[in-house]
Design a protein with these regions (language model features):
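Short, small-residue-biased leader/transition segments that mark boundaries at the very start
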Residues: 2-6
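Terminal, non-catalytic domain-edge segments
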Residues: 8-10, 17-172
């Protein structure tokens, strides 16, 4: 059922994706796909949309390379530096010191992620009685998985999707 949602999104996104629209939706879909180990054909469908739109983004590249190691990095920039440039910092830190990368990600989750989305329509939905499914920084969970970080210190932090990252820890 969860993969049906992705398939449905793949059908509708091409009609609505604009140069500045659907960046976050694609980031979320890629991130959730990485965390929940979606089938390659689903991830490939997302990748094809990115290719078709020539969307060059560091986070997209990092996540895609995790599933498809032959993917060539298209850029060392993020399409939306605020708040997403942190992904570059965390990735670079992880190459040298994974514990420092987790600390930086923790700071991002605590102080920067929600505030960095203040210009989006869903920001502060909880204050207006609007039904919503919470605020989730899906890309943080995907980065933890991709970079092989120990996220035990992130468990319970607002916005961090710990259970998604660890959904299959006990399934063998």
């Amino acid at each position: 059922q969860r993969q049906m949602c992705i398939r449905d999104s793949l059908k509708t996104m091409p009609r609505f994706w604009t140069d500045n629209g659907f960046y976050i939706e694609m980031l979320w879909l890629l991130s959730i796909g990485i965390m929940l180990d979606y089938e390659d054909d689903l991830i490939h469908g997302l990748v094809q949309l990115i290719k078709d739109r020539e969307a060059k983004d560091y986070i997209y590249d990092t996540l895609i390379r995790y599933r498809f190691p032959d993917w060539e990095r298209t850029t060392n920039q993020v399409l939306y530096p605020s708040p997403y440039r942190i992904a570059i910092t965390v990735t670079e830190l992880a190459e040298q010191d994974k514990a420092e990368a987790v600390k930086r990600l923790e700071k991002y989750l605590k102080k920067e992620w929600y505030r960095g989305h203040s210009d989006l329509s869903w920001h502060d939905d909880h204050k207006y009685g609007i039904n919503h499914d919470g605020y989730w920084c899906f890309e943080s969970g995907a980065l933890v998985k991709v970079l092989g970080l120990d996220d035990s210190s992130l468990k319970g932090l607002p916005y961090y999707p710990y259970d998604m990252v660890h959904w299959n820890d006990n399934i063998k």
